[in-house]
Amino acid sequence: MTELARVSSALLELSDGQGSPRSAAFNDIYHAADGPAEVTRVFMAPARLAERFAAAGNDTMTIAELGFGTALNFAVLADTFVGCAPAGARLHFISVEKYPIADPEFTAIARQRAVDLPVYDALAKHYPARLAGWHRRHFHAGRVTLSLYYGDAADGLADLVRRMARSVDHWLLDGFAPARNPDMWRDGLFRDIARLSSAGTTACTFSAAGRVRRGLERAGFQVRKVDQRPHKRHSTAAFYKGSRKGPLPTFRAPSEVTVMGAGLAGSCVARALAERGMDVRLVDDPARPATEIPAATVNPRLLADGSAQARQRLRSYLYSIHWLDRFHATACHGVLQLPGGRNTAPRLELLAAQYHDMGPWVRSVDAATAASVTGVPMRVGGLLLPGACTVDIGRLIRELREHPRIHLRAPEPTQVEPAQPRILCTGAAISEFEETGYLELLPVWGELQQVQITGGPRLPLVGDGFITPWGGGYSVGSSYEQSPWTPGRARAFNLDRFESWWANTIDAPLRYEAIGRVRGCRAVTSDRSPVIGPLHDPTGAPRKNQFISTGHGSHGTISAPFAADCLAAVLNGEFSVLDAEEDACVSGLRFLQRQARRGLRHGARPPAEEFG
């Protein structure tokens, strides 16, 4: 079995009686005992960051850091930013970390510091798993964004050089002393720091070593020493003088974006754009209302391998449970994955082996533990996902639209090559746009039954179908209809499967009453993966200002929020957290590439040469 690309945890120990954390591998402390004060005097004051935050207007300020460590720099800067920046300003904090602190140790650190720096609570709750690559989290209702790279700093910065359109406003170079961690202070890193900077970009570091000063100077920075007595003799501050070789131009995000489709995918996109300061025309067709499922589970559909698709699913799941957690329509009480359907007991054991050391977000449980968490006697164990959510889709859509920058509009005639970006999120109806015909997207109907169960589980169960608690009882289902079934067929299918699955997994008699149903139509791609990113012309080139989020199928609660962040980040000059292989799994370009080999299938049409 191919393993997921994971990173090693830091070897952490406590120095002196004041509890300053120390890296055993590098024999160096993460920060002084007066950590928050040290952050201010070394990394903020020399660059006048508080003043710059206050003058940020409605723009995004980008801070980048080498060495995430205990997250102290991030927490102090986030707290300062929220306290003094205008309400319309945003902070994008980018950090790289080769050896992240393990989850139990980070949780203990966060618990101690959250009293003074509350962002620690939110970060510890959704601390990224040890999956190599980028992770993103949002705080303070979207005003503060953390993009965290797990891996070598050189790889993380090189990826930013390739993909980020915005320049960095300020650098925090905080990767242990050069003598103890020389790889962090290579000339190649300084060159990439310069490539990601523009004239006036500042940098601060605790180190005053000549190697550090010379590296910054060779990269185009003007360097000065900062008196740090009585704490130490000097630290270093610098500003970028500019160069002809690669500093990024000033980036301007679009002032307005049109989102076609106001269901779950479109409303997620609209909210992600609005929280990044863009006005959104959210086009809602009342003739095609979104399916409002009262209780949809956020179930990751984990894969037991190290493929790009496995990484993409895990990244999507962990991001989405974090993002959805702040809305009233979401209840994060966990989900229990049981044997059933394709997820046999041996396959669940493979999944447990694959993910057991990547954090507390998943764990294998036996039948006794399963009974304890669900409140019903269980015949089998399974995989417990403690942070998984249940979402009231209709309520969530209404919540997502409640933002002053989102403006609901009725459909209008399609414009040709609009000057402002347009994002298509119309589900199965997306095939009506001529330029989307190559996407291999099909409508698949489905139905779930609403039942009342005497003595039912208190957590959602997924396996051979699902049993999900909601305010009025339970939802069970659902059918998967390539063409709509005759009336009553879906009800019989769902209830028969529900009764059989209950008998095989729950050690108690089933007493229930069917009380209703919900029908809807999913947009499903031929490979069951969503479509996220630009639309493409017949040559495979991305169409200017034309993007898409669709094909979320039965798992829109996982992929739709994640897709929204990927698209909004790119439009705001940031970057998607997907690596190139993961992006290929969700790009619509994959269909054009397959069609070049085997022709059109699954109802696909050649893409239009022009719009209209």
Which positions does each model-derived feature cover?
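Rossmann-like AdoMet
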Residues: 1-61, 78-115, 302, 584, ...
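The AdoMet/dcAdoMet-binding core of the Class I SAM-like
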Residues: 55-166, 187
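Active-site substrate-recognition segment that forms the wall
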Residues: 244-276, 285, 292-297, 302, ...
